[in-house]
Amino acid sequence: MNETAADRVAPRGFTELPDLAVRSLGGAVIWADDEFFAEKENLIVPEAPEFRPATYGHRGQVYDGWETRRHRGLPGDDAAVVRLGVPGVIHGVVVDTSWFTGNYPPAISLSALAIDGYPPAADIAARTDWVPLLDRVPVRGDARNPFPIPSRDRWTHVRLTMHPDGGIARLRVHGEGRPDPALLGLGPVDLAALENGALVLDCSDRFYGSPHQLLHPGNARRMGDGWETARRRDDGNDWVRIRLAGPGLIRLAELDTSYFLGNSPAAARLTGRTTDGTEVELLPRTPLQPDTRHRFPTAAVAASVEEVRLDIYPDGGLARVRLFGELGG
């Protein structure tokens, strides 16, 4: 069987894949049955959880997470529903109980749904057709609890259940974006967008920032919202490989160095790999400016490209990469 770009995912653990639920990708915690001690929205904050001892509010110690009241032997469990910022295939989750020591749940479970449209949150929570992805499993307190998920279906929402109650700092839902196929093909598309199904396969260096952020929606908000490499002390250069949303024809490349001032690359080059394995040059080595959204027309290529490699010279940081074109071709 011929290898495709979809098969060439870097052989790392699932935590190297993007977090589909994170707030910066548009994720939202749309419902929870209880959030007495700490708000449900904290579950998907992109930053790591923090703790300030002896910091009390009207309801006790302040926790950076989602925390419910004690059940005290009463029946029932607590649950929260998360709408994924990028619907997709879930490869694994991390249930992070950092700083929750005497108040973490003994066990959790996870289920999912694929929903069309935008029904009310209460209607979604009340549905009875949730599909189990993770049966009831024990978790440790003050720890990152990773769980691989074998499902390869596309999901839009997940439901996290605590058995019976307690607190969780963060929920990370790692996977690959899968867009609504009904929306693709309606016009030009960003073939490098995570929300359209693109994925970073590999990169030379990720010292200061994750390369997955290159494919995030919207503009970067600060330097840390992009990909930045360490300073090179050799004659090489840094690079990143991206699997496109699907085979297509790239017409326009946007290379955004916003917020990178003294650390933007001096130049960049873009090459593509067609569906038959041929390498083609889409953008020759081209100078870049600091803190600038560059837009370059790409070379006309007759065959569809399914994967690209962006080389930066010699190192530095980029905020976003956009590759506009059409699927197919």
From Swiss-Prot:
Transmembrane segments: none annotated. SUPFAM superfamilies: Galactose-binding domain-like. Pathway: Nitrogen metabolism; (S)-allantoin degradation; (S)-ureidoglycolate from allantoate (aminidohydrolase route): step 1/1. Its EC number is 3.5.3.4. GO terms for biological process: allantoin catabolic process; purine nucleobase metabolic process. InterPro entries: Allantoicase, Allantoicase_dom, Galactose-bd-like_sf. It catalyses: allantoate + H2O = (S)-ureidoglycolate + urea. One of its GO terms (molecular function) is allantoicase activity. Keywords: Hydrolase, Purine metabolism. Belongs to the allantoicase family. Pfam families: Allantoicase. This is Probable allantoicase.
